[in-house]
Structure formats: C-alpha cells, structure tokens
Amino acid sequence: MDDVTIVTAFFDIGRGFWSNTHKRTTKFYIQSFLNYLDYPYKIVCYIDDRCIDYVLEHYTRSPHRSVTFIPINLKWLEHNIHAWKQLPKDAEIMKSSIYKDYLNNRLTIMYPNGVRPGKDVIKMFPENEIPEYNAINHAKIDFINHAMQNGYIDTSVTCWSDFGYFGTQHKNDQSTFPKGTLDRDRFSKDRITFFIQKEIVEQDIDPLYILVCAPEMFTGTFWGGPTNLMPSFQALYHECVEELYSVNISDDDQHIYLRCCLKNADLFDLKLNATGEWPKGLLFFQKKS
C-alpha cells in the first residue's frame, strides 16, 4: 500500500438547488467520487449518511478495498467539526451592514480610477452569501485531523482531495485521468504543498482587497504533505479564520490558505500552476511510469 492517505468529504448543503452558475447536484458529486473507486488509493471518506448506501453498493463492485467510509450528518458535524461550530459566526457576519458595505463597494475598490469594463454589476459569490459553503470548505483541515485523532491515518503523507475532484478538474473525462497512484516522494518532506494560480503580491496582504476582488490564487481542490504537520496547520488555519472574523470578514478556504501562508510561509511549498486551468493534483503527484 502506498504511503499516502487521501481524505475527502461530502455533505449536502443544498447546492443542487442553487439558481446560479455555481449550482452542482448531489448526483454530480456522487458520480465524480465513484471514479476514485477505480484506483487503489487509501482513502478516508466522510460522507453524508443520506448518500452512503448508494456509494457502498458501488464500492462492493470495486476491485479495491482501501476506502474507510464514515457516515456524517448535521448533528455529527456540529459535534465533531470546529468549522461547523463557527457557522453562526459566518451567518452573523454575512448579514451585517459592515460586510454588505464591503461588498457593495466592490466595483469602487476594483476600479479606483472609475473605468469599469461592461455593465456595473456587483457580482456575489457563494462565499459572500452562503455560510454553509464557507463552513464546509473550512472543515477540510478539521476532517483530516479528525481522521488522525481517530486512527484512520497511518501514512507519512496525507492529502486533501475534493469529493468532486474528477468532475471539477477532469470533467469526468477518463482520457485525462491519472494512470497511477500517488508518489509519496513527489511531496515535500517538510512542507504542505499547495497549487497557486498566480504569485502573491503586496496588495494581497490586505484581507479586504482579497474579499472584494476575489482573485484566483490558492486552490483548495487538492493539497497535501507530511501527516505530522497537519495539527500545526489546523491551529494556524483556525487562528487566521478568527483574525478575519475580528475585522468582520467571512470568506472561503482559498482566502484562509493565503492568510496562513502570509503568517507562516515556511509551512508551505507553493507550486505555480501556469496552465490556465485548475490544477490536477492527482495527476501531478502520480507515480511516473
């Protein structure tokens, strides 16, 4: 068995009923996840208990037996996951007049010279309006540490890979899928590896700029590194979330990864993705034939 564990999770926050371009159905997520079962990846999967029977039925037909499934529900999240316990805080901030003013000034901050392309439309993203979206994304590091604390991980490297990875990164196109499993030696031995879409510059230090302009920088679909660094990363992550709360900002995991890196750059190994597409982590870290 390879010395790498993948942790992933799915909890239905109602995204299938969203009426915008960010809509994704439960079917989309499940069909994406089933592709994992074609590989001998060692996986710890936290899965909505409303979906687990369907997935387990498919798992019985998989040639591999390397997935540990943990059923979850709302009560489980409220009891076990720090990020979910913070959900009321995210909701409170999103409803506040201060936060709404930040976002209502989005066009002014993005175009301080007054020159704006196209129509003056203030675009909102899920991380600005849906507290459950932020909570479930902040929970990634909490799921990893829960798996560690409960003995589900015995490998030297641990990765987060999104439940819907094959759908979002590969469009479920099997011709683009990885051919092999993950190579422990391709990960940094003393840092956590993240893909970034652009270099960090001085203006990125300002959390209000990141909230309002929402540049594509850190990606949260796939990241990983030495298992023994995950508790330190969790503590740093929680600290950075609290710092944003203190200035009345709720934002998604991509913003928090940036804040963590600014606070402790030595913890991170950053891979600049220059393809113009979202990075395919399972492909990048696969064993070379």
What function would you assign to each model-found segment?
Residues 45-50, 72-74, 196-200, 267-283:
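Acidic carboxylate-rich catalytic motifs and surrounding loops in phosphoryl-/glycosyl-chemistry enzymes
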Residues 142, 155-156, 183-184, 196-200, ...:
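Non-transmembrane, aqueous-exposed alpha-helical and coiled segments at domain scale
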Residues 6-7, 44-47, 157-162, 193-196, ...:
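A structural signal for short, well-ordered beta-strand segments and their strand-loop junctions
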Residues 165-241:
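Conserved catalytic core of nucleotide-sugar-dependent glycosyltransferases
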Residues 10, 47, 73-76, 148, ...:
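Short, flexible loop/turn elements at secondary-structure junctions
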Residues 1-135, 139, 143-154:
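N-terminal anchoring/stem segment of glycosyltransferases
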